[in-house]
Swiss-Prot record:
Protein name per its UniProtKB record: Cyclic pyranopterin monophosphate synthase
GO molecular function, one term: cyclic pyranopterin monophosphate synthase activity
Pathway recorded for this protein: Cofactor biosynthesis; molybdopterin biosynthesis
Family as reported in the entry's similarity comment: Belongs to the MoaC family.
EC number: 4.6.1.17
Entries under Pfam families matching the protein: MoaC
Record's catalysed reaction(s): (8S)-3',8-cyclo-7,8-dihydroguanosine 5'-triphosphate = cyclic pyranopterin phosphate + diphosphate
Function: Catalyzes the conversion of (8S)-3',8-cyclo-7,8-dihydroguanosine 5'-triphosphate to cyclic pyranopterin monophosphate (cPMP).
Binding-site positions, substrate: 83-85, 121-122
Gene name of this polypeptide: moaC
Length: 169
């Protein structure tokens, strides 16, 4: 949401004055360093986790393939989300934390750009597609895996400033 009226009342930015969907015009915005980090969690059976950890999944390197899928997805966000701007991203990093006590894999993506619009959707798309890829690679042994906890952890740059999950309360 942005503030579209003089009183500063929140409004959805992807709609014009008639309520029609519209891509936001960012041409007047200053180019600044934009960074966003998102996360997702894939929960699974302990046996599935052990196979991922040991590299025993028949399809191959689960985390390596999921990392590449997440990076590719971040670069293709504008093709997937209708009103996102196509962006020349500076950096996309996709990392994994193995959580044996849960058992789960936590996925984190950080996207960087010097530009006129944020990269939150690119980071969220990266973790989403990385999670879907992990599911695809492992579904032969565990169709009961769950994907959840997809959220923005941090964003900085631009007019709206810095956001950190948990700071909004």
């Amino acid at each position: 949401m942005g503030t579209g009226d003089p009183g500063g009342a929140p409004r959805l930015t992807h709609f014009d004055e008639h309520g029609n969907a519209a891509m936001v015009d960012v041409s007047a915005k200053a180019e600044t360093e934009r960074v966003a980090t998102a996360e997702a969690l894939v929960s699974m059976r302990p046996e599935t986790f052990a196979l991922i950890e040991s590299g025993g999944i028949a399809k191959g390197d689960v985390l390596g393939v999921a990392r590449i899928a997440g990076i590719m997805a971040a670069k293709r966000t504008a093709d997937l989300i209708p009103l996102c701007h196509p962006l020349a991203l500076s950096r996309v990093a996709v990392d994994f934390a193995l959580l044996p006590d849960r058992p789960a894999v936590r996925i984190e993506a950080t996207v960087t750009l010097k530009g006129r619009t944020g990269v939150e959707m690119e980071a969220l798309t990266a973790v989403s597609v990385a999670a879907l890829t992990l599911y695809d690679m492992c579904k032969a042994v565990d169709r009961g895996m769950t994907i959840g906890g997809i959220r923005l952890l941090h964003k900085s740059g631009g007019k709206s400033g810095t956001y950190r999950a948990g700071d909004e309360a």
